[in-house]
């Protein structure tokens, strides 16, 4: 994979893997909860793999962003960096919500088993499983949208900077300074040194 922030798809792959991790959990639950002895540990396997792989992909995305586009080298608006980092935060919020819903589901099913209700374990777990998957899809789309928007606008501003075009005339430091020559002459007259006669006095 090429180390270039503009040319890879780590953000898309990270969110895709995370969504698949939660979605495949529906099939895992169907197999593990319909058995005579429910196996809860399998419910954490695919989400765990999705979280780990997604986090690694996002780590490289942030790392390459910091290496390729430091502020000292390129002058783009920092708001796009904030948008990009917000996309990263949404991804980890996605992870947190998914794990919390999964833990709540396992706790609910455990209480059913303690009450000797084994027949509808999978059916009762479906609302939690679909809620986790749906939430993951929505937050992943938000994360991808924010990250790719930042990618796009930072690239545009960097290309403008390379061509010598100001990215935003109202926010750059190279503004024209207006000097009033008449005012300067007036100040010079007021600050002129005293004459020789005044000095002798």
UniProtKB/Swiss-Prot annotation:
Keyword Nuclease annotated: no
Keywords attached to this entry: Cell membrane, Membrane, Transmembrane, Transmembrane helix
Composition skew (Polar residues), residue ranges: 192-201
Protein name: Uncharacterized protein MG028
Bilayer topology term: Multi-pass membrane protein
UniProt subcellular location: Cell membrane
Bias (Basic and acidic residues): 165-174, 182-191
Family annotation (Pfam families): DUF5453
GO cellular component: plasma membrane
Region (Disordered): 165-201
Organism: Mycoplasma genitalium (strain ATCC 33530 / DSM 19775 / NCTC 10195 / G37) (Mycoplasmoides genitalium)
Annotated TM spans: 9-29, 42-62, 86-106, 126-146
